[in-house]
């Protein structure tokens, strides 16, 4: 179960009582859209609203929201949870210098910008225990206007802090997952391995061959797949027998119904397996 808060990547139409979305600072995301339901009953993507900055005394309440979400997940039977601190959503917005312009204890230095995300992690650990909690991060990502002046330093700091807490895993998204030329700096993966004692997972634009190579480098323990898994419900088996993959239909992403999510076919039972 993944726990997340989108922060400024939202709109007043989907907020309680039509309130503004919240963020570390009142900066609107660039080119950001969210899925909303319109007055005529239809639904679709819509540009996000300008957020308001969270008051300092509101932040503990959001930490408590995460704690309660973890408690509900546990009662529902989920074995573990992943804290989503990636993809330009709320926790990522606090970590990055371009979206966090605060002057209180939640802004400025590395330690201050990481304070809220780590408070969330601690709250979730209180519910599940550290060995049942992971976190997803996207250092170096540039999305919806989110930028960071010191992404490597923040990634290293977070890795060290999470390692001290005994977190089960750290899940890192490749910065070029949506295209582009941004990559991790030389030596970054090795440094993350040194700083984090739990399992490391990478994801984003991988295929089977590239995933095997990455694991062989000993810089990661696993590679995760998202979009290929949506379009290929039997993805591990396709990898095992070297079968062709179905390409996902991007037009159905965030569509709000089953089309493009649960209607992709499994392999033909007669597929000639390649050993």
Please annotate each region the language model reported.
Residues 2-275:
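Flavin-dependent oxidoreductase catalytic cores
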């Amino acid at each position: 179960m993944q726990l997340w808060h989108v922060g400024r990547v939202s709109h007043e139409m989907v907020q309680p009582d039509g309130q503004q979305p919240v963020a570390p600072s009142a900066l609107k995301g660039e080119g950001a859209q969210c899925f909303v339901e319109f007055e005529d009953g239809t639904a679709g993507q819509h540009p996000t609203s300008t957020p308001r900055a969270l008051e300092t005394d509101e932040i503990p309440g959001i930490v408590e929201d995460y704690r309660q979400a973890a408690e509900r997940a546990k009662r529902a039977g989920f074995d573990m949870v992943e804290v989503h601190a990636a993809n330009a959503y709320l926790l990522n917005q606090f970590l990055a210098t371009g979206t966090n312009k605060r002057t209180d204890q939640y802004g400025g230095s590395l330690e201050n910008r990481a304070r809220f995300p780590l408070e969330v992690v601690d709250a979730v650990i209180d519910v599940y225990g550290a060995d049942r909690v992971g976190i997803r991060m996207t250092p170096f990502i540039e999305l919806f206007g989110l930028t960071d002046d010191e992404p490597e330093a923040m990634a290293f700091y977070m890795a060290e802090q999470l390692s001290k807490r005994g977190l089960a895993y750290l899940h890192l998204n490749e910065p070029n997952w949506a295209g582009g030329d941004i990559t991790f700096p030389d030596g970054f993966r090795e440094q993350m391995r040194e700083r984090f004692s739990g399992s490391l997972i990478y994801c984003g634009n991988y295929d089977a061959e590239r995933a095997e190579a990455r694991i062989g480098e000993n810089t990661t323990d696993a590679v995760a797949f998202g979009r290929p898994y949506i379009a290929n419900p039997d993805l591990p088996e396709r990898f095992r027998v070297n079968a062709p993959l179905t390409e996902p239909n991007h037009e159905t992403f965030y569509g709000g119904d089953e089309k493009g999510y649960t209607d992709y076919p499994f392999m033909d039972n007669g597929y000639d397996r390649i050993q």
